Regions:
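A residue-level marker of the well-folded mature domains of exported/periplasmic proteins
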Residues: 1-166
Length: 166
């Protein structure tokens, strides 16, 4: 569509697999699955939207139950505690958006060692601590596309500001 060229410029080819492996994961084909989503924090628009998308996908699949749970502030220690508690409960999968890519790795490895599938989104961990990481686009591609779009709209001498947060 016209006007969406910037959105596709940041896309890249699929990356080769670089993740860890669960140990002794049981064959769950056709059986009920319990998955927990532990984002950086709960109660904000972005993670409310990802949670809704996961709920919608679970409903489509039919045999998946997804629970979104996590800290109300972006706190890695609390996030680790949530994941550890769900490992103890015996979930089949952990979805996460890491508050700290290194600090979260041991609890994710613990999940893998327990045969639990681990997938990150939005904010990665170290690769060996999860199976897959899903990201919307690469940051440098998004940034380049945004600046290219700005220049196309305003010219190459326009003034602009950048606002960011964590």
């Amino acid at each position: 569509e016209e006007g969406l060229g910037w959105a596709t410029e940041g896309w890249t080819a699929a990356k080769a697999y670089d993740g860890g492996q669960p140990t002794g994961a049981p064959d769950r084909a056709g059986k009920p699955l319990t998955v927990v989503d532990v984002p950086k924090l709960i109660g904000i628009g972005y993670f409310n939207a990802t949670s809704k998308g996961m709920q919608d996908a679970a409903k489509e699949l039919g045999n998946v139950t997804v629970t979104t749970d996590g800290p109300t502030k972006a706190n890695i220690d609390e996030q680790i505690t949530f994941i550890d508690n769900y490992i103890t409960q015996g979930v089949n999968g952990v979805l996460f958006a890491a508050n700290d890519p290194v600090a979260i790795a041991p609890v994710l490895q613990k999940a893998l060692d327990a045969g639990i599938h681990v997938v990150g989104y939005d904010a990665n961990s170290v690769p060996e601590a999860r199976e897959w990481f899903v990201n919307q686009a690469e940051f440098n591609g998004i940034g380049k596309a945004m600046i290219d779009s700005l220049v196309a709209e305003q010219g190459d001498s326009a003034a602009f500001g950048i606002v960011t947060s964590t």
